[in-house]
Structures are given as structure tokens and as C-alpha cells.
């Protein structure tokens, strides 16, 4: 991929739904957030329908798809229920993520290398339906190679550890994790995969990731929604977009 190619920004609106569900009502509406994100220049919207429905609800998916003209990236666990929902809605993309009920957010990458036969069979109907499948994985050679082996066209590399080390001020660990992400992105492209990255990115951590020519898309949610409380979603996205473009 050319280093001059525009880096896409996918905006995850899950935590608008988290705030809505804290009171059990209808507001703030994640569908409105998706529309505003599109108006502010998002290249796609990401929404994760978790098995416990802790933020996004079933009805939100159809409503978001009806309200936006940009692609929806539907995050989902590799369960029969979620496969049925994805095939019913036919979003542009489906990102398969690991899920544990006790976690606050997606804590690790999907285990592909040890579950490749099942996952190959699982993603086949999604691909056949025209859904672009991605796998949310750690930047580990075994996982990236397994993703390519089972026929997933896209991987999203987990940037959470890199961002956590940065927040803790552990420069050595942060830089080591960044090196892993760089190597993972290069390997992914070598294997014919489209490479995305996401999880925990903010204004301080986005530039080194955005600078990688192998990366086609970043998915950012929690930070943008949090920042929007203070400056508004459009301003938060504009600043993020500027930092991404400057790094490119």
C-alpha cells in the first residue's frame, strides 16, 4: 500500500450506548452518534453487539445501517447466534473478536492458531454472503499466519498493550510492543492481508501507528466518545483525523 494512501478512520460508537444503558432509557442515541460521526468524516462505523448486550442492542444494528451511508463494521463473537444476526443484516464487514463476560472491554486477541479449523468453517458463510471478515488478533506471527491460512481477508491488530504501556510511562515496553505491531503489519501485508489496528488509541498514541504504510484503517471509539463530552464529537474527530494525516 502506498504511504500516500489515506488512512481510514472507523469510529466505534459502543460507549454512547454504554451511557444510554446506564439509565435504561433511549438517550443518548448511538444511532445519532453514528450519523454525526459520518457527517464529521468517519470512513466507517464500528458497533460491537456483545452476547450480554451491555451496550449495543439488537435493534441498534438495523437502525444504524438504515441511518448511515458509510460501511458498518459489525464486531461479534464467533457464536452461532452472532453468525445468524450478521447474515440477517449483511453489514459491510464483520470483525470476529474474543469475548469473556467478566471483562470490561475486549482484553486480548482472538485465538486463531489453536482454533483454525472451526474458525475457517465459521467465517465461510459470512464470506459467501459478501461480508468482509476481519479477525481481531494480537500481533503474533502464529496468529497472523493462521488468519491468512483460514482465508480471512483482513486482520485488526490489537493496540491495547501498546497504549497501556504508554499510559503507564513504560517507554521500553511501549516501544517493544510498537515494534511487534510494526512487524505484524509487515507480515500481514506479505501474506496478502489487509491490516487494520485498534484498541485504546488516543491523541498521544495514534501517530506512530498511523505512520505505518501497511495499515489501511484505524478503529477508535472509547477515547473519541470520552473526548466528545468536553469538545463535541466533530471536534474530537477532526483533531484525531489531523493527527492521523500528519503522521502519514
Swiss-Prot record:
Pfam families of this UniProt entry? PdxJ
Q: Where in the cell is it found?
A: Cytoplasm
Q: Name one GO molecular function term.
A: pyridoxine 5'-phosphate synthase activity
Reaction catalysed by this enzyme: 3-amino-2-oxopropyl phosphate + 1-deoxy-D-xylulose 5-phosphate = pyridoxine 5'-phosphate + phosphate + 2 H2O + H(+)
- InterPro entries recorded for this chain? Aldolase_TIM (IPR013785), PyrdxlP_synth_PdxJ (IPR004569), Pyridoxine-5'_phos_synth (IPR036130)
- An annotated GO BP: pyridoxine biosynthetic process
Amino-acid positions noted as binding 1-deoxy-D-xylulose 5-phosphate in the UniProt annotation, renumbered to this chain: 14-15, 50, 55, 105
Annotated residues that bind 3-amino-2-oxopropyl phosphate are located at 12, 23, 200, 221-222
Pathways involved: Cofactor biosynthesis; pyridoxine 5'-phosphate biosynthesis; pyridoxine 5'-phosphate from D-erythrose 4-phosphate: step 5/5
Q: Where is this site: Transition state stabilizer?
A: 156
- Organism superkingdom: Bacteria
- Signal sequence span is none
Q: Which Enzyme Commission number(s) are listed?
A: 2.6.99.2
Primary site of residence: cytoplasm
| Entry GO CC | cytosol
Keywords, ordered alphabetically = Cytoplasm, Pyridoxine biosynthesis, Transferase
Check the record and name the HAMAP family matching this protein.
PdxJ
Protein task = Catalyzes the complicated ring closure reaction between the two acyclic compounds 1-deoxy-D-xylulose-5-phosphate (DXP) and 3-amino-2-oxopropyl phosphate (1-amino-acetone-3-phosphate or AAP) to form pyridoxine 5'-phosphate (PNP) and inorganic phosphate.
Q: How does it assemble?
A: Homooctamer; tetramer of dimers.
Question: Which family does this protein fall into?
Answer: Belongs to the PNP synthase family.
**Protein name listed in UniProt:** Pyridoxine 5'-phosphate synthase
Amino acid at each position: 500500500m502506498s504511504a500516500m494512501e489515506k488512512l481510514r478512520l472507523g469510529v466505534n460508537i459502543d460507549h454512547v450506548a454504554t451511557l444510554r444503558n446506564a439509565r435504561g432509557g433511549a438517550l443518548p442515541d448511538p444511532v445519532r452518534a453514528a450519523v454525526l460521526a459520518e457527517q464529521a468524516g468517519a470512513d466507517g462505523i464500528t458497533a460491537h453487539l456483545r452476547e450480554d448486550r451491555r451496550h449495543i442492542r439488537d435493534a441498534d444494528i438495523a437502525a444504524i445501517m438504515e441511518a448511515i451511508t458509510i460501511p458498518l463494521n459489525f464486531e461479534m463473537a464467533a457464536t452461532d447466534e452472532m453468525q445468524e444476526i450478521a447474515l440477517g443484516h449483511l453489514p459491510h464487514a464483520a470483525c470476529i473478536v474474543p469475548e469473556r463476560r467478566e471483562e470490561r472491554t475486549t482484553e486480548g486477541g482472538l485465538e486463531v492458531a489453536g482454533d483454525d479449523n472451526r474458525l475457517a468453517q465459521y467465517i465461510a458463510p459470512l464470506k459467501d454472503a459478501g461480508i468482509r471478515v476481519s479477525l481481531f488478533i494480537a500481533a503474533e506471527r502464529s496468529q497472523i499466519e493462521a488468519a491468512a491460512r483460514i482465508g480471512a481477508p483482513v486482520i485488526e491488530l490489537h493496540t491495547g498493550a501498546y497504549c497501556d504501556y504508554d499510559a503507564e510511562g513504560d517507554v521500553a515496553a511501549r516501544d517493544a510492543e510498537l515494534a511487534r505491531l510494526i512487524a505484524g503489519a509487515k507480515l500481514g501485508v506479505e501474506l496478502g492481508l489487509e491490516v487494520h489496528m485498534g484498541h485504546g488509541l488516543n491523541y498521544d498514541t495514534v501517530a506512530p501507528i498511523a505512520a505505518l504504510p501497511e495499515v489501511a484503517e484505524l478503529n477508535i471509539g472509547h477515547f473519541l466518545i470520552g473526548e466528545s463530552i468536553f469538545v463535541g464529537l466533530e471536534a474530537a474527530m477532526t483533531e484525531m483525523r489531523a493527527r492521523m494525516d500528519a503522521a502519514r
